[in-house]
């Protein structure tokens, strides 16, 4: 009996083991091994599962709620092949992922070649920056995803990089091409990179959001179209009246696009001339003469003058009578300037970006006069200016577009970016590295080096005069007092001096009263006349008999 019981228990245990083994085998068989050894002597080969394509990448999650109710096409720019799968989107929302190739920029195309110091304004050419030309359905996308090059980027200076410019222009080109094909089609551009896009092409007003290194924009296509009309640098004079469809980058055979020409200004804009006075009244006379010269040229555009508390009520009355609409501002100190230096408060000029009740402004320094009507400048985009030296522009006259977010950006960057000259010009050149060249006729600087300007005269086709050195109203009208000071003779010209006084002569007696001489001004003039006489300066201007009536009618201080 005991033996039977023992055998029975053994059978039950064996059956239990078999059932457990079968259960474990059933669990193991459905799983495939992650690797296998192909032969005893071969190298170990590991077959890993294929990476899963990201069906809902971050850029899509960010803009999903902005997309139209249709299947979208996505264009990718500057996305490395190894990264493509992680950025591509799949699913019912996406019709097609299109990777747009970028041709290499020739090695001889550098930033200096795009921004030469001097050009022949009548016959200049620019290097070519190749832009992609998608054809057919590939040229019509709803979203552009572009990785922006950030090599060399720093928060302390501007980034002048031709590859970065190419990617930004390519994104703009593709957006405009797509927007032409469907009326009122919105195109979104997503930039990936810590430095973000070039704000000269994609301004902050068009930014939908920024999340870490993702920058989402909904560009205003008429403005973007005009950007693409501009030369790729200051290597050519920017056109003011241009038609879309005639850009250098557009193939001539695309007649269907060229027929959709629009003027550079898509709608009626509110525009104005603007200048700034701060810290002293030294330029009140200059601002009055500037306003009068604008009116004498035939322009009837609005004129805005920003001023701080240092401008007296008496001067404000004269400025208003000259034609300026007055607005009080608080000064802005240049963060890197020395205390009590001449440029300590020059960043006050940045306040012009706060004049947001206007779409476009032409800023002009108060030591300018206008000789020919300059209203055509309002057709230029931000930032347009005349060249200064090297790759830099002169901020004495510039076309800009007011913007609250741009002003905020300028303020934030003013504490990080140090100006090369301590003033606004050096700072703005680090902000707007991609600018558009105006003719030197618009900003003809009163400067004469002995090598090129021995006669100290200017051509007759000058449209705007920028008075460097001692200003005409602090000299006798009889001659340019820059002649009396050796180191200032590069600014001296009697013929250019006379042009300012022609504007003065057409002013009312009330306005002329703001341009008089006081006793201290006369003493300074006479001091340098004596020094010039003692040094026997060869031009002998110190011998000229002074007949300026202001000399005998000095202002009471």
Curated annotation (Swiss-Prot):
Its cofactor is Mn(2+). This is Putative UDP-glucuronate:xylan alpha-glucuronosyltransferase 4. CDD domains: GT8_Glycogenin. GO terms for biological process: cell wall organization. The record marks 349 as: Important for catalytic activity. Belongs to the glycosyltransferase 8 family. Glycogenin subfamily. One of its GO terms (cellular component) is Golgi apparatus. May be involved in the substitutions of the xylan backbone in stem glucuronoxylan. It is an enzyme of class 2 (transferase). Substrate binds at residues 365-367, 394-396, 421-425, 466-471. The gene is GUX4. It holds the Pfam family Glyco_transf_8. Its main location: Golgi. It comes from the Eukaryota. It is found in: Golgi apparatus membrane. It comes from Arabidopsis thaliana (Mouse-ear cress). It is a single-pass type II membrane protein. Keywords: Cell wall biogenesis/degradation, Glycosyltransferase, Golgi apparatus, Manganese, Membrane, Metal-binding, Signal-anchor, Transferase, Transmembrane, Transmembrane helix. InterPro entries: Glyco_trans_8, GNT1/Glycosyltrans_8, Nucleotide-diphossugar_trans. Mn(2+) binds at residues 365, 367, 466.
């Amino acid at each position: 009996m005991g033996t039977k019981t023992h055998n029975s228990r053994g059978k039950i245990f064996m059956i239990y083991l078999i059932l457990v083994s079968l259960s474990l085998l059933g669990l193991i068989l459905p799983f495939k091994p992650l690797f296998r050894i192909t032969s005893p002597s071969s190298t170990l080969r590991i077959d890993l599962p294929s990476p899963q394509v990201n069906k809902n990448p971050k850029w899509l999650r960010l803009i999903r709620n902005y997309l139209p109710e249709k299947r979208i096409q996505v264009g990718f720019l500057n996305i490395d092949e190894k990264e493509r799968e992680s950025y591509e989107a799949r699913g019912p929302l996406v019709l097609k992922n299109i990777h747009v190739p970028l041709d290499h920029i020739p090695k001889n195309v550098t930033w200096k070649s795009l921004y030469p110091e001097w050009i022949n304004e009548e016959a200049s050419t620019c290097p070519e920056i190749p832009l992609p030309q998608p054809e057919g359905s590939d040229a019509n996308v709803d979203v552009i995803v572009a990785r922006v090059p950030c090599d060399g980027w720093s928060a302390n200076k501007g980034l002048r990089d031709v590859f970065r410019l190419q990617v930004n222009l390519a994104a703009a080109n593709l957006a405009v091409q797509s927007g032409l094909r469907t009326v009122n089609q919105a195109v979104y551009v997503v930039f990936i990179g810590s430095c973000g896009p070039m704000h000269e092409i994609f301004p902050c007003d068009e930014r939908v959001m920024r999340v870490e290194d993702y920058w989402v924009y909904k560009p205003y296509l008429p403005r973007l179209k005009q950007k693409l009309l501009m030369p790729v640098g200051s290597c050519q004079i920017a056109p003011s009246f241009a038609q879309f469809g005639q850009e250098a980058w557009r193939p001539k055979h695309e007649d269907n696009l060229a027929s959709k020409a629009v003027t550079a200004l898509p709608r009626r804009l509110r525009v104005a001339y603007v200048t700034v006075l701060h810290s002293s009244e030294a330029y009140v006379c200059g601002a009055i003469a500037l306003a009068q010269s604008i009116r004498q040229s035939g322009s009837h555009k609005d004129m805005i003058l920003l001023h701080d508390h240092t401008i007296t009520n008496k001067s404000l009355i004269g400025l208003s009578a000259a034609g300026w609409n007055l607005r009080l501002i608080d000064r802005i100190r240049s963060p890197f300037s020395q205390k009590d230096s001449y440029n300590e408060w020059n960043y006050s000029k940045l306040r012009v970006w706060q004049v947001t009740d206007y779409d476009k402004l032409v800023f002009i320094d108060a030591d300018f006069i206008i000789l020919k009507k300059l209203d055509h400048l309002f057709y230029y985009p931000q930032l347009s200016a005349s060249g200064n030296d090297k790759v830099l522009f002169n901020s004495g006259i510039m076309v800009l577009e007011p913007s609250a977010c741009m002003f905020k950006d300028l303020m934030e960057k003013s504490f990080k970016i140090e100006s090369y000259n301590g003033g606004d010009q050096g700072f703005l050149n680090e902000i707007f590295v991609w600018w558009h060249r105006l003719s030197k006729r618009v900003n003809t600087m009163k400067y004469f080096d002995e090598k090129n300007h021995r006669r100290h005269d200017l051509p007759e086709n000058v449209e705007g005069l920028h008075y460097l050195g001692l200003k005409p109203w602090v000299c006798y009208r009889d001659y340019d007092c820059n002649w009396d000071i050796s180191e200032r003779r590069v600014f001296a010209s009697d013929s250019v001096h006379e042009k300012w006084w022609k504007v003065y002569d057409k002013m009312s007696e009330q306005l002329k009263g703001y341009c008089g001489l006081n006793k201290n001004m006369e003493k300074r003039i006479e001091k340098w006349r004596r020094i010039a006489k003692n040094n026997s300066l060869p031009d002998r201007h110190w011998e000229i008999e002074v007949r300026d009536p202001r000399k005998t009618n000095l202002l009471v201080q």
